[in-house]
Every structure is written in structure tokens, then in C-alpha cells.
Amino acid sequence: MGENADGDQVMENLLQLRCHFTWKLLFENNDIPDLEVRISEQVQFLDIKNPLGMHNLLAYVRHLKGQQDEALQSLKEAEALIQSEQLSKRSLATWGNCAWLHYHRGSLAEAQIYLDKVEKVCKEFSSPFRYRLECAEMDCEEGWALLKCGGGNYKQAMACFAKALKVEPENPEYNTGYAVVAYRQDLDDNFISLEPLRKAVRLNPEDPYLKVLLALKLQDLGEHVEAEAHIEEALSSTSCQSYVIRYAAKYFRRKHRVDKALHLLNRALQASPSSGYLHYQKGLCYKQQISQLRTSRNRQPRRQDNVQELAQQAIHEFQETLKLRPTFEMAYVCMAEVQAEIHQYEEAERNFQKALNNKTLVAHIEQDIHLRYGRFLQFHKQSEDKAITLYLKGLKVEEKSFAWRKLLTALEKVAERRVCQNVHLVESTSLLGLVYKLKGQEKNALFYYEKALRLTGEMNPAF
């Protein structure tokens, strides 16, 4: 009975800690192997002044995999960093994780030792909590952990870095974290990451990763000269590794220098053969080459053979991506679009449906999948009714993203064409009413709704 009571007390204390076991890190179980690879790469390649957090996250992921000995080893590496760098506040997450891990291993005495270490630091900094310290350093640690665990965590990660920056506005690491997570969320045309990236580069002038992200954002804005300068600086850096090269490859692919992008990706894959993201980027390169062939004026007889060959290469790369990251929904979508290009319609439809079946889709991704699946149905399967259904489902996801606006445009175009061609006239006119309502143009919306009602009356006098 006493042992259970001790266990209950230890658990009560553990729940007060700020560490990876208590932060609500959202990711799918299927993502854990790829997450482990990405964390290992970040520890190895990404020039972070303090890799302590990545060792801690690696330990947590290994714990989730049931690899308790390996998890303990990662925490020992983190503890070694604490001792060598004389860290105090930032040691709290490590010691908290150690306490949790020993608890799960059944070592209550060991767990209590680490709880005592946390308590000592909390007392040192006059925390009102016995096992918890509110400080910028811990906000930063939590922010990095959330950032690394994927899109479902980005808003919370941004809040953590913003909170830390209120305390130290010029801190280089806090600005790095804030800029990176802003970039990851900057998927619309409001460019929320541009100034944070500029500031982070100013505070971290030797960081090639930040430079390549800034280059990509400048490319979005059409600032090509400045973007190219940052890319050249990033690639010439002595610390430039595969984590930087993959983003540089994205820059060159978007610049239509696909051969250069493929060269960089192959170079990065030699260092990181288990990176799902690198395979995905290669797939996008082959997909872009297919589009270039389709729009080329050069009508060579072998062009269709080239399309088939490129399609198979793209599909292979997306399949490799999904072996490593089984829940990466956009790999399914891009593979489906390539399959549609070579008339593999059944396979394409299955992959679109797999992408939509992911229950953890963030809003703008869900909207984008509905848009691209709808286009497939409209233009490849000639099924406008089903396409309209998908556009409407996407618009029900209410976040006003870039994808949401493209859905609205797609619905407007198909409705206008159907009205002109007198196809399902009442329904099509009503759809135009909905389009204008969603645009906020109430007067136009009312016009089309009333027109639809009049058409209904003409077609069905008994109504």
C-alpha cells in the first residue's frame, strides 16, 4: 500500500514538470520512425547553438517506440551537455524527462532524484511552484519541441517563441525559432515570416539555414536578386549540410532549374538516405518536368515516352517518401496527380482518398486536397457533379486560406460555365449565389438566389 502511495505521489509531482512528457506534442504513431530520423539529422546537421532540446526530443521519441535503453542514452548525452555548458534553467526539461523515464522503468527512487534536482533549480530562481519554472528558456525549449513535431503544433510553437521574445527581444535563438515557425505557417500571401526572417539572419549572420529560408520567402515576393545572394551565401557556408541543401533545391526547382535541384537533392540523399522529405522533393522535380513537357511546343514523337518515364520516376520517389513518412498526405496527392497524367485513374483516386482519410489534417492542407481532388474529377474524370461536391466540402473548412480562395474560384468558374450552357440551371445559379455570399458580396448573392427561386417557379409551378 505504501509503495502505491509513493507511486501516486511521484506521479502527482511528475505532472507538474515542464518537459516532453507533459507538453502536448501532436503527431501520428506512423510518423515516429521518420520523426526520429529528422531529429537525428537536426542534431547532426542543423547549426543550433544548443542541441540539448533535440537530444531530449530524441529520447522521448525512443521512449514512445519502447526503446527505453536508447532513450536513456539520449538523456545521458543531454546531461553531458548540461555539465559541460553549466546550464541551469535549460536543464529542467532534461531532468524532467529523466524523472519520467525512470518512473516508466519502475525506478521510483531514481525518478525522485531527478525531481529533487528540478526542485533545487526552482528554489534557486524563486519559482512559486515546487517543480515548475516559468521562464523564457523553458518557453524556447517547448517551442523547439513543438516545431519539430509537425504542422499540428506550429501555432502553439509560435506562441512559445513569442512569449520568450517578450522577455529577450534580441535573443538570437528565440528569434530563430520564431522565424522558422512563422515561415512554416506562411502559406498565404500575407508574408508573416519576412521580417522575422530578416531579423533572425541579422542576429545569426553565420546561419545558412535561415538564409535559405529567407531566400525562398524573397522568391515568393519576386525579389530574385536578393534571394539569389542569400542562396549563394548559404551554399558556400562551411556548415552547409543536407538540411540546408534540401531547401536550396526547392529554390532552384521553383526557378525551373530542375537539373540543378536534382543534383543538390542527390547530394543531400548521400548524407541522409532515410529522409522522406528529400525523396518528396525529388518527386516534385520529376512532376515539374512532366508539366514542362506537356506545355512544350516541341512535339517530338518520343515526348509521351519521356512523360511515362518521368512519371514512373516521380511515383517511385513518392512511394519512397511514404515508406518513410506514411502519413505525409501531400505525397499521396502529388503521386495521384502524376498517376492521373498517365491515365492511372483508379490508383490516383485511391491515393486522393488516402490523403483525405488522414484525421489530423490542418485546415489549409485539407482545403488544398479537396481542390486538387476536385480538379482531378472535373478535368480527368469529367465528373463535374462530384468535383462540385468536393469544392463545397473544402469551402466548409472555414479558414480563409489561399487554398480556400482557389476553391471559391474553381466553384465560381464551373457554376458560370454551367449557367451559360444551361446545365442544371437552378442548382448552378444557386451556386453562384453561394459564391458571392462567401465573397461577402451580399447584393450579388441575393440577386442569384432570387433568380434561382424564379427559375424554380418556372420549372415547377406547383412549388
UniProtKB/Swiss-Prot annotation:
InterPro entries: TPR-like_helical_dom_sf (IPR011990), TPR_rpt (IPR019734). One of its GO terms (biological process) is innate immune response. GO terms for cellular component: cytoplasm. It comes from the Eukaryota. Keywords: Antiviral defense, Cytoplasm, Immunity, Innate immunity, Phosphoprotein, Repeat, RNA-binding, TPR repeat. PROSITE patterns: TPR, TPR_REGION. Induction: By type I interferons, dsRNAs and viruses. The keyword Zinc-finger does not apply. RNA binds at K250, Q281, R325. The keyword Zinc does not apply. TPR repeats lie at residues 52-85, 92-125, 138-171, 174-207, 209-241, 242-275, 294-328, 329-362, 367-401, 426-459. Its main location: cytoplasm. It is found in: Cytoplasm. MRNA binds at W144. One of its GO terms (molecular function) is RNA sequestering activity. Plays a key role in the innate immune response as part of an interferon-dependent multiprotein complex, recognizing and sequestering viral RNAs that lack host-specific 2'-O-methylation at their 5' cap. By distinguishing these RNAs from host mRNAs, inhibits their translation by competing with the translation initiation factor eIF4E. Belongs to the IFIT family. Interacts with EIF3C. Interacts (via TPR repeats 4-7) with EEF1A1. This is Antiviral innate immune response effector IFIT1. The lineage of its organism: Eukaryota, Metazoa, Chordata, Craniata, Vertebrata. The gene is Ifit1.
